[in-house]
């Protein structure tokens, strides 16, 4: 993911993120996961944040119309503040993923992630409305709220942004 915004020629937002989560089912509704995330946000107070986590997930609802999963796990986080200070900490990770199929060609997604460490709590909420355009292309309207509980003085703890994007599904 890459997000940038400019107002009157001045950059007001610049964030990049990449991640991967692998799942291994061991019953119809239970699974183990391994996840890794990298985030770089110029205006968050953190130069970069990387996390690795393993844990357990449970599908509470899994029907043709909707799905709800919750996850919990443990891991590690490596962060670099904008002043160059490095922070390494263990984390507890929790997540929620909800999907509502509105029609054959549209759906609503709500994802929530929290990573609690000794030094910082990171949380992210992502609400998205996805509409199929043609073939594997879809239009996605999303609203994201990101929060770091411990940031340098003068930096906002919470960042919000709205995005309109085109998504290609495999």
What positions do the PLM features span?
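Solvent-exposed loop/turn segments connecting transmembrane beta-strands
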Residues: 6-14, 40-48, 82-88, 115-124, ...
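Detector for outer-membrane/organellar transmembrane beta-barrel domains
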Residues: 53, 59, 63-115
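Transmembrane beta-strands of outer-membrane beta-barrel pores
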Residues: 1-7, 36-42, 58-60, 74-80, ...
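Repeated loop/turn-to-beta-strand initiation elements of outer-membrane beta-barrel proteins
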Residues: 29-32, 64-68, 102-108, 131-141
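Membrane-embedded beta-strands of outer-membrane beta-barrel proteins
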Residues: 18-20, 54, 94-96, 127, ...
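Membrane-embedded beta-strand positions of outer-membrane beta-barrel proteins
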Residues: 1, 34-36, 70-72, 94, ...
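Outer-membrane beta-barrel "beta-signal"
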Residues: 53, 129-132, 158-170
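Outer-membrane beta-barrel proteins
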Residues: 21-28, 57-62, 78-80, 100-104, ...
């Amino acid at each position: 993911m890459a997000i940038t915004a400019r107002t009157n020629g001045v950059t007001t937002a610049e964030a990049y993120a990449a991640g991967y989560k692998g799942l291994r089912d061991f019953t119809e509704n239970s699974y183990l996961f391994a996840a890794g995330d990298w985030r770089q946000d110029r205006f968050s107070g953190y130069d970069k944040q990387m996390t690795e986590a393993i844990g357990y997930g449970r599908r509470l609802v899994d029907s043709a119309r909707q799905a709800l999963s919750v996850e919990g796990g443990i891991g590690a986080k490596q962060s670099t503040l904008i002043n160059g200070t490095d922070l390494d900490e263990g984390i507890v990770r929790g997540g929620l993923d909800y999907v509502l199929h509105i029609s054959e060609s549209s759906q609503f997604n709500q994802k929530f992630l929290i990573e609690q460490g000794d030094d910082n709590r990171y949380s992210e909420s992502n609400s998205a409305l996805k509409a199929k355009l043609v073939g594997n292309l879809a239009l996605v309207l999303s609203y994201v709220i990101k929060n770091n509980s411990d940031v340098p003085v003068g930096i906002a703890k919470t960042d919000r942004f709205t995005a309109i994007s085109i998504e290609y599904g495999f």
